Every structure is written in C-alpha cells, then in structure tokens.
Amino acid sequence: MSKFPSEKPVLVTCGLPYANGKAHVGHLRTYVPADIFTRSLKKTGQEVTFVCGSDTHGTPIVFNAEELKTTPTEIIKVYHKHFDEIFKKMGVMLDAFGTTDDPTNHNRTTEIVSKLIENGYVYPKTIEIAYCPSCDRSLPDRYVKGTCPHCKKEARGDECDQGCGKHLEPGELEHPACTTCNGPAEYKQQEHFFFKLSQFKDFLLEYLEGLGGTLNARNYALGWVKQELTDWCITRSLDWGIKFPGHEDLVVYVWVDAPIGYIAFTEEWAEANNESWEKFWKDDGSIIHFIGGDIIYHHCIFWPAMLKGAGYNQPDAVVASGMVKIEDRTFSKSRGYVVWVDEDYLDHGFHQDLLRYYLASYTSHTKELNFSWKVFQDKVNTELVGVFGNFLYRTLLFTHKNFGEIPEGEVKQDILDEINTTIENAKEAMENYEFKKYADTVMALASYGNTYFQSNEPWKLIKENKEACGEIVKNCAQITKALCLLFEPILPEKMEEAWKQIGMETDVHETNYMEATELVKSGTTLEKPSILFEKIEDEKTEEMEAISAARVKEAIAKENGTEEVEEVKEIEEMKDLITFDDFSKLDIRIGTIVSAEAIKKSKKLLKLQVDLGEEETRQIVAGLKESHEPEQLIGKQVAVLTNLAPAKLCGVESNGMVLAGVDAADNAILLQPEKETNPGTCIH
C-alpha cells in the first residue's frame, strides 16, 4: 500500500552545507535526491515542506577567518549566498534556507539546551582539553590534529575524517599538534558540560528498530548503540557560536545547534507563510532527513536522543547517501579531492539536469559513487540523448511535420496500462528512496515508446492511411505527456520545456502524476520541437578528465608528497571448468554485517557477526583487517558463502566466508549487492 499521499504533513530536510567553502558534486548527492523526493511527493498530492540552511558555527570557520584576517560573519555571508545560488542553479527548490546564526536558531537552541538541563540530562565534568603553549590557547576540534586512537590514522580533533570515521571526544586524540603553528600540543584540565547520552540506550534501540529511510543509516546506528554508549561533551571553549546557558566563556558544540537548525528553519518558513512549525516538531507531522553517510552517527543517535530529552518529535526516516569519491578518494574540499559545481560543471556549459540525472541514476543511493566524467558522458549520450531525447524529438517532429497538431484517434488501453504500471512502480521506488530504480523505471517507458513508434512505422503509414497514422502519433503524445510528468522531479527545467512542446498550458511542476493518463487533446497545436539533449563530445570529456586528474595529482602531492603510480596487478590464471552441479552446491547469500572487531593475535583477520536472516547472527572470520576499519563495515551488505564447513582461525570459530576480490595493492574489495535487500537473499 502506498505511503503517500498521507494526511500527515511531511517535512523534508537536508544535512546543512558548511559555510566555509564552495559547493562540490559530493554535496549534491544529498541535496538533489532530496529535491527529487520532494518534487515527487508533491506530484502525489502530498503536503510537503522542504527546508535547509547553512551550518555557520564550529572551529573551521573561525580558523578560516583568522587565516584570511576577516570575521566569521563575513565568511558565512559569502558562502551562504554561494550555496543559495548554487541550489537555485541546480534546481534544488527549498521552501526556506536559513543559517544557524539566525536569531531564530540562537533562541531555539537556548530553549532546547535549557530544557535538557532542566530535565536532568546535562552535567558538568572536568576533562582534558588540548592546549598549545606556543599560541597560548585552547585547541577545540579543528584547531588540533593528531592520531586517531581507534585506527591510528591522522585525524582532526572531533572526527577521524579520512580513517574510521569515528566521532572523537575532546582529549581522545593521540599525539596532539596545533594546526595553527604545527607545534606540539599538551592536555590541560577544564570544566565542560556533557549530555547523558548513555541514559537513552533503551530508547534508541527501540527507536532505531522502527526508523524508516535507508538501511545503512539504521543498521550503522544500531551497531553503535548496541555497544557501550558514552556521554557526549556538548560545549566548546570558543567565542564564536551560541552561548551555553549561564556560561559566557563556553558555546554549545556545533553538532548541537546545527540539527536544531532544522527546527529553526521550519519556524522561519512557518512565520513567512502563516503556517505552524509545531505540526512537524510537536504534533503528528512526519520528518524525513536526507544526509551524507558520514553523519549517520549524529542524526541517528545524538539528535533523536536530544529531541526525546527536550520533548520534541523524532525523525521518522533518515536517508543516508553513499560517499562520493574521485579516483577512489573520498571527496574533501579541505584536502582538494573535489569536482566543483560552479567552475568544473556549470561554468563549462553543462545543463543542471544532466548532473541531476547522473546522480540519481548512476548507482544505488546508499552505495559509494566514484565520480567519472566518462560515465557521465555515457549516461547522457546513451540514455538521455539516445533513448529519451530520441523518442521525444522524433515523435514531436513527425507530428509537427505531418499534422501540425495532436491528431484525432483513440489512445489504446494497453498504452494507458503501461503508463499506469510505470507510475505505480516509480512511486514505489521513490517511497523506498531508490532513485536509480525510479530513473530506470521511467527510462523504460521511453524505451517502450521508441519500440512502439518504430514497430508501427508511421513514416510508411502516413502514405497509406493518415488516419491510422494519426492514432499512432496520438498514442506517442500520450506517452510523451507521461514521461514529462514522471521525469519532472529529476529533470525539472528540461521537462518544463518538453511540456510546452507538446502544447500543455498548465504548470508541469504542479501537475499530479495521475494526470498522465488524462487524454491529450486532439487539435492541440504543436510547434516545431527543439532538441532537448545534445551529445557530449569525447573532446569535452577528455578536457574535464584532465582537469580532475590534475587537481587530484596536486592534492596527493600536497598531502603525501610525490606518489608513484601503482603497477597493474597481473590477472590471476583462470581455474579449471566446473559443472553446474558443482556450482549449485555453493549456498551464497547476502548478509548484513552487524558488528566487527579486530582479532588481536592476527594482522589480517577480523571477527564479524553477520545477519543472514537466521534466528541468530553468524560469526565469520574474514581477512579484511588490512583494508577495512571494523567500524566502516557495520551496516554493509556482503556476499557470504554460508555452507562452508566451520573452521578455527587464530582460535576463533568461523562459520562461513565473506567473498571479496583483491586490487593491485592486495587490498580486499568487498562484493556488494546493487541495492540493499533482505539478509539471507540467495545469490543464484
């Protein structure tokens, strides 16, 4: 049964862009799908509001302002305007876009933190804080760097961003150093305030079991909550930020006031539209967060616990995207692994809708996306130009030349059935946050239209029976109308143009999906159509690849010095042929990793608990330690050989095998399903 439209109003939010640098393609992996989802809900008749805002507090902005000899206020003014403009250029149409430094957010944050204090969920504690004797200052968050205590990779003060991804509390970082002078730091004692996150374990376990959205968010969070939950330091020694109640020398941690921004932006929207923000955050509205996969911990653990403690509604769904990479390196604007939205894309003349389609259709939303200009070119040329654009142009041009209008004729029931089936399948995909499946489903209707046009050969029929030919092109016009409505969430500007080309006078953005089967009107004048999608030439792709390669090379040189190119690993010799009977003896299934820990006696082995749809999880030992951090594996779905005889490795029993390949550097590469599925699903 379809979830939308529902009587409950829906609030869609996005993880806040940090107002400390420009927008890159990695940002858009969150914002474009959220916009697609919102547009789609509107097309079902659902009441939906879409809000976001700039994250304007925290140490990176202060750090940047000091380097540029300006103020945090000036920094955020520049980048808030930048993101607002980029979103509009990319068709991300927000109902409100505020900042966390708005008075509304200051007031709402103070109210919520005060309520947590009043309810007994906040307490003071003396802890060790990094301090630089050379600069004579405390070093919160990005002011300090060092070694992650968990994975031993270089990390920032509040997170291991290039290693295991763990949130780090003050004082945890090993071998601390000041990021301002690069000198060694030391730890000093200071009083800060903590949120009693540990008291919310039972609540979080129950809450997460019922959390909607994508499985990677729920499973990752559950894996953490099932372990020991530690209380959370929610203050920092900074001047910039929202003051902690009663303490002018402290501000609340940015991960407290940033998500509270969702409430503040809803308030700002409500005030501007004479609406109620409480219908989402206090009453029975539904809240859906779209975020990047790197901030699941904050949105699925800290945030719902804070909301519960302060008496607010918790999110109904969290939709977490896979990270975007370039040449297998995670996007990072500070490190230089990026493709900028303006100078690398829009300024080169690429249309906004092409990138929207690429991001939606390339791979499952929860999987990592390794950005490729070549794949981008192939998606545009093969699908948008070769399939969809080809059907639109040949249909409309033929109709214009031979009829000048939509001719008389009956729209066949099988055409209407195909459209209805496509609508239902597309809506189901969208409700499950499967944007690739949605795009593929709609593109299949374009392929159906091409086949229908080609098989009926109207260019021949026009010479023999113009009336019969007219009926064929009218059916094609009906398919075109449906495609415009179904592709509008992904290709809003192009579909606005196509909508006009088929003679429609209504607003395609405000037209319900179900109007796709309302018959096109015979006699509607059709002007000569324009070509909606142009091929991307190889020379342009090569130019863009060269720009990206140069930037990555520069980033590597800056970060690690000169790096030799790895030799290509020789392909292993193929094994002897086996019979199908031999293969059928293998029971290979999809499993979800629910916990992972190192085996101390081994340099290569990890002990995993894997959900295979059985009553209990399966313990499996896997040689993944050198290539994967245990925390990064939690929530991942993998291929498992389940009927391998039990064996003991380093004294630990293993009841199966996780299947993986090996790259040129002998790192394990996990085999994962195209989209998330039920644990225990058989691989045939």
From Swiss-Prot:
It comes from Methanococcoides burtonii (strain DSM 6242 / NBRC 107633 / OCM 468 / ACE-M). This is Methionine--tRNA ligase. Is required not only for elongation of protein synthesis but also for the initiation of all mRNA translation through initiator tRNA(fMet) aminoacylation. InterPro entries: Anticodon_Met (IPR041872), Met-tRNA-synth_bsu_C (IPR004495), Met-tRNA_ligase_1 (IPR023458), Met-tRNA_synth (IPR014758), Methionyl/Leucyl_tRNA_Synth (IPR015413), MetRS_core (IPR033911), MetRS_Zn (IPR029038), NA-bd_OB-fold (IPR012340). Its EC number is 6.1.1.10. Homodimer. It comes from the Archaea. Zn(2+) binds at C148, C151, C160, C164. ATP binds at K333. It is found in: Cytoplasm. GO terms for cellular component: aminoacyl-tRNA synthetase multienzyme complex; cytosol. The gene is metG. Residues 582-684 form the tRNA-binding domain.
